[in-house]
Amino acid sequence: MVSGSVRKHGLAVAGICVLLLAGTACSDTKADGGGGQSTPGASTSQSNTPGASSTPDASSTPSESAAASIAVVPAKGATSVQPDKPVTVTTTAGKLTAITLKDDDGDKVTGSFNTDKTQWTSQPQLKPGASYTVSGSAEGTDGATVPISSTFKTLKASKSLKASVVPLNGETVGVALPIQIFWNNPVKDRAAVEKRLSVKTSVPVDGSWHWVNSKQVNYRPKNYWPAGTKVTVNIDTQGVNAGNNTWGTSGRTIAFSIGKSVVSNVNVKTHTMTVRINGKLARTIPITAGKDGFTTRSGVKVIMEKFTVKRMDAATVGLKPGDPEYYNIPDVKWAQRVTSSGEFIHGAPWSSGSQGSANVSHGCVGMSLKDAQWFFNQTLRGDPVIVTGTTRHMEPGNGWTDWNTTWAAYKAGSALS
């Protein structure tokens, strides 16, 4: 399944379209944030010139041709136009022949004509605090071309909305990686923002967005990503009103790939880790896990970071020098982070005598250097490690914990559920 959004927009034309006869004057109507501009073209009609003779053969039937009369919304010269409102250009006679909408940087805004080309409507995705120019032409039923030109400015946002994303563009990741979008400012109108987010996949995938808080929204599938899937995330938030005068100032697209399926299961009670690659058992590894007082958490963990060498200092988990449990090892090899609080899977040659038989670590899963290197070379950021055998469970947000939430509860975290 491809998640996305369909947007419907109403049309409000506040301007007055006036078809003027030749020789009359015209004036523009200006209104901040709205209104419409009416641009009459030249019109043709039969002359009643004084002194001209009238004969029975002279036709009294009025001409059916007319010059194009144009209305642009927002009005020419308008300021503080809301970026999430569409721009419309309408003619009451003839048809529009070409319309272009550009900002002051030269970036075009896409739009479309209706069936008979009497109206053009832009996508409602303008930049806040920008100047825009509408240009083009229309052709009246009289065959005459009428030029179109109008300018306006959008309102200035007091706060912008920009996104940073996990994973990286072009990255190949594991089958359990949740898409994570971090906003630079809080989102009040989550539904409006979520409508602008979409995920496209090369194979059908059932997935959902889930708001972690007002500054983070994640996406994961119902089940692990199928191996080899190509994924494109479109963050189409330019011009979106996130609430509290916070407006999307840009959008971005992220494309990434899912690698092979590497699913690992750690059984703390049996002191083993099994690794299955594309569904087949690849290796069973003797391990040691957390001892009493440092129990390894059970739950679905996801590899977040990988280090060929990593310093591990117990001060990061609250232990101080002088404590009998304190350690500071400068060169732990083949370390892979699975929690924010400091649990890793890594090589632990100092505990080789306990691997496969006892739990002696401070919470990490340790193994031989040979097995740790092999495991490191198989995995990607985003691969799942499922830990069982303890009564201590994963806390929400202590790492990439999306898979510890039921699918029903996860979907309920969508602002559009």
Where on the chain are the PLM-derived regions?
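Acidic, low-complexity Ser/Thr/Gly/Pro-rich repeat segments typical of extracellular/periplasmic
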Residues: 2-260, 287
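Conserved beta-strand and immediately adjacent loop positions that scaffold enzyme active sites
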Residues: 98, 135, 272, 334-335, ...
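Structured segments of extracytoplasmic/periplasmic soluble domains
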Residues: 182, 186, 190, 276, ...
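Gly/Pro-biased beta-strand-loop elements
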Residues: 161, 245-353
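Pocket-edge structural micro-motifs
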Residues: 74, 124, 221, 305, ...
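Short, glycine/acidic-rich beta->alpha junctions
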Residues: 217, 258, 265-268, 366-371
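Exported/periplasmic cell-wall-interacting domains
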Residues: 175, 298, 315-417
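Short, surface-exposed secondary-structure junctions/capping segments
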Residues: 39, 43, 55, 297-310, ...
